[in-house]
């Protein structure tokens, strides 16, 4: 499953990040521009001084910035990493609608943004009389082929995991969490105990209570993003190095 960007990407050099949602960069023409950053995570391993990033131009006079960051180059190689947190939902939803997302291919797509239990869930699926709530998380942090989520403390993410666990235990719906790595150089995904132990413990408990944990990679090019391969999600606590 492939999701095209449908726009030309412009190479730029990362200069600064004044706040979570703004990046200052230098285009190859030498012009310095301000760009919106869709991913509010720390991204400290990607947005390094002089890092290569790619921007798309947004022709919208009402916007504060006329550029948006699309992806960056991983420092350890030629792999591109998507920095647009809206892409995983778009990509996976498109695959689910066509029943081409293999880990859940037996489930039929019903709708996006389904509200239940006080929260809005990314996708609702159905298989016969059973229904499944799916939450999709964007993963960018990776070290030596292992991806970690989250890359910053997420109270909202912890709340969602605990709510899904309660729903699973109630028997009203089946539940699943998909951790989609927005990069291809990943062989395993783990909760980041060294960054957010509360989320990580909640995810481990969710798995014990029957919430399905799915891991998947994606491949990013200058033309678009496509689904990669399923990878293992390991919720066991290990000693990791925190920065």
Swiss-Prot record:
Disulphide bridges, residue numbers: none
Signal peptide residues on this chain, from the entry's feature table: none
InterPro entries assigned to the protein according to its UniProt record, in alphabetical order: SfsA, SfsA_C, SfsA_N
One Pfam family hit: SfsA
Gene3D superfamilies (UniProt xref): 2.40.50.580, 3.40.1350.60
CDD domains: SfsA-like_bacterial (cd22359)
Gene Ontology molecular-function annotations: DNA binding
Similarity-based family: Belongs to the SfsA family.
NCBIfam families according to UniProt: sfsA
Protein name from the UniProt record: Sugar fermentation stimulation protein homolog
Originating species: Halalkalibacterium halodurans (strain ATCC BAA-125 / DSM 18197 / FERM 7344 / JCM 9153 / C-125)
């Amino acid at each position: 499953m492939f999701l095209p960007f449908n726009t030309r990407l412009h190479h730029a050099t990362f200069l600064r990040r004044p706040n979570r949602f703004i990046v200052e960069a230098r285009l190859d023409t030498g012009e310095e521009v301000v760009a919106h950053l869709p991913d509010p995570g720390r991204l400290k391993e990607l947005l390094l001084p002089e890092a290569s990033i790619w921007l798309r131009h947004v022709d919208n006079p009402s916007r504060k910035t006329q550029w948006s960051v699309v992806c960056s180059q991983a420092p350890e190689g030629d792999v591109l990493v998507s920095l647009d947190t809206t892409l995983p939902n778009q990509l996976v939803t498109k695959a689910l609608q066509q029943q081409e997302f293999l880990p859940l291919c037996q489930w039929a797509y019903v709708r996006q943004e389904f509200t239940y239990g006080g929260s809005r869930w990314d996708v609702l699926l159905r298989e016969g009389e059973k229904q499944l709530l799916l939450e999709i998380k964007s993963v960018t942090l990776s070290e030596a082929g292992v991806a970690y989520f989250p890359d910053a403390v997420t109270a909202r993410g912890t709340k969602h995991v605990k709510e899904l666990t309660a729903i699973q235990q109630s028997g009203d719906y089946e539940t699943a969490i998909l951790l989609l790595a927005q990069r291809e150089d990943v062989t395993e995904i783990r909760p980041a105990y060294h960054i957010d132990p509360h989320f990580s413990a909640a995810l481990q408990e969710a798995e014990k209570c029957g919430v399905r944990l799915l891991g998947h990679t994606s491949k990013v090019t200058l033309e678009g993003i496509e689904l990669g391969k399923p990878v293992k999600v390991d919720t066991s606590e290990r000693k990791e190095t925190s920065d």
